[in-house]
Structure formats: C-alpha cells, structure tokens
Amino acid sequence: MRTQLFTALLLGLGLSSIGHADVIGLKADASYWNFDGYSQSANASKQDLDRQGTAQLSVAFEHPVPLLPNAKIKYVNLDSNSEQSTPLNAVDIELNNIDYILYYELLDTIVHADIGAGLTNLDGTVRNLNAGALTQYDLDEYSPLLYATAGVKLPFTGMSAKAEAVYSHGSDIKKTDVQAELQYDFIDNLLVDVGAKVGYRIMNIDAEQNNAPDLELEFKGPYIGLDIHF
C-alpha cells in the first residue's frame, strides 16, 4: 500500500502543471542544532540523551525546466549518548541521516510551497545497555520519503517564516522529521541572498530488528544557522 501511494504521488507530481523557478538557483544551508531527546526499547525504561551540538546541512538545486523536479540533499549527524550512564544502564548512538529529495514548487511568491518525494538513509549503530543486558541495533536502510515545505515572506522587512516536514517509512524504520524557523535576510541583491535564522527541530525514529525489542528514538532542540541563495 505504501508503495502504491508513493508511486501515485510521483506520477501526480510529474503530470501536474506545477510552478518552477524563473532562473537556475543554488541554495545552501548550514546550521548548528543543539539537541537532546531519549532512547527507549520495548519493555525497558526510557533513557534521556545528553544534550549535544551538531551540524545540519542542506543544498538544493532549482531550475526553470518545466516538469523536471528540483533536487535537494539534507544531512545531519545524530551521535549521542545517555545523560546518566551507569555500569548497568547506558545508551551510545552513532547515526547519520541523509535525505535525497526531488521536489516541485507549488507556489513561489511571497507565499511559497514545495512538495516532493525521495529516499532517506539512516546509517549507524545504537547500543542500549538496560539492566546489564546489551542490545545492539545496526541500522542501514534506504526508505521512501514524502517531503513538504511552506513559508511566507514579509515584504520590505527581510523577514520570513518556514516550516518543513519529512516522513519516511521503510521495511524496518519509520521516521518523522519536522522543523520550523524564522529568517532575516541581511544581504539581498541580484547576485546572492544571505539570511540568518533560528528554528526548532524534532525527529522521531522507530526501528525494528530481528531478535531485538523495538527501538524508539527522539531528537529535539533549537538551532541557529545561515542560508545562502545564489
């Protein structure tokens, strides 16, 4: 069923008369995400994660060719560990997330909206020590994703607001990733736009593995960063 919905969305996107960029453009984003969260396996107590700082990066390419989708890649490192570790209870997370997205612009005025689809890759290891019993989860899966973003610009102020969501569901991993931000463009000309932004991001991951309890992870926290548009 998920495969049928995913295919239908791709066909709908490709056949619709959807807006596109007026010129070729390149967008890049670099942010510092200060997150905490928790790790919990079935039938075990929740273990809070120590607050960490990490880089979250994205790059997008847009063009004026009708029906051909734009492309975007998002990356974040999710390495973390438990806030309070003991010889019997601890969590160690070594995890990377990359989203490969093809999307279309539905609107591109003072109000903008994009919708797309693609693949997400979660790759790494989660080690849960609970009551002295160690369970290791080895994650490496490409899952289909759905992508949407919407935002609004306040004319003549340089201010804008945006919300973005990614949802993926594969055979063993489900992920929900939502973020919202405010941005101020302090450089705005024909060559380049540069903005400073502040936002909040929440990512939830549910994973299954043979002969292991189901795993639930949450990462959440504020971020600050720069956005550049050529």
Mark where each language-model region is.
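Gram-negative (and chloroplast) outer-membrane scaffold detector with strong preference
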Residues: 65-159, 188
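Transmembrane beta-strands of outer-membrane beta-barrel pores
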Residues: 30-36, 63, 75-81, 119-125, ...
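Residues on the lipid-exposed face of transmembrane beta-strands in outer-membrane beta-barrel proteins
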Residues: 57-63, 100-104, 117-119, 146-152, ...
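Transmembrane beta-strands of outer-membrane beta-barrel proteins
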Residues: 24-28, 57, 69-73, 111-117, ...
